[in-house]
From Swiss-Prot:
Gene Ontology CC: one annotated term: chloroplast thylakoid membrane
A Pfam family per the record: Ycf4
Gene this protein is translated from: ycf4
Species per Swiss-Prot/TrEMBL record: Coffea arabica (Arabian coffee)
Its biological purpose: Seems to be required for the assembly of the photosystem I complex.
Full protein name: Photosystem I assembly protein Ycf4
Length: 184
């Protein structure tokens, strides 16, 4: 989503609170709890899961492996739930022609650098760059190239924009900032 006026363009960036992340975190949590319960029930010799008889699973080695997969899945699931709750990657890109400043803000992981805030002068922007990689896993990313600072990604690598959408976005931003477009 973007908000625009004559002199200011604010592009809101969606972080890790996406439906796909919620689905993966939930599926991973349920699956890992299932694996852990099967491993524990094979150790205890009791059915903790009613639709799967624990007598068919021997604790060594199947029960141990299932327990390990369950614990590993719980760690990965809790990592996903933490990134969702902290909303890592959420933020905005603010382009202000009147002030001549570009501000990029993102939320990171908790700690000293939780708030990621970058500020540049518009006159230091060298170009808007489109990077296109075709193939099975096609990828189109929009970058802003800053003199002496390198490139800063403006779109997520998993955003999956069509060639027309990425070109349109790059053209509008380059026109707004009055900088050229480069395609790689």
């Amino acid at each position: 989503m973007s908000l625009r006026s004559e002199h200011i363009w604010i592009e809101l960036i969606k972080g890790s609170r996406k439906i796909s992340n919620f689905c993966w975190a939930f599926i991973l949590f349920v699956g890992s709890v299932g694996f852990l319960l099967v491993g524990i029930s094979s150790y205890l010799g009791r059915n903790l899961i009613s639709f799967f008889p624990s007598q068919q699973i021997v604790f060594f080695p199947q029960g141990i492996v299932m327990s390990f997969y369950g614990i590993a899945g719980l760690f990965i699931s809790s990592y996903l739930w933490c990134t969702i709750s902290w909303n890592v990657g959420n933020g905005y890109d603010r382009f202000d022609r009147k002030e001549g400043i570009v501000c990029i803000f993102r939320w990171g992981f908790p700690g000293k650098n939780r708030r990621i805030f970058l500020r540049f002068l518009i006159k230091d922007i060298q170009s808007i760059r489109i990077e296109v990689k075709e193939g099975i896993f096609a990828r189109r990313v929009l970058y802003m190239e800053i003199r002496g600072q390198g490139t800063i990604p403006l779109t997520r690598t998993d955003e999956n924009l069509t060639p027309r959408e990425i070109e349109q976005k790059a053209a509008e931003l380059a026109y707004f900032l009055r900088v050229p477009i480069e395609v790689f």
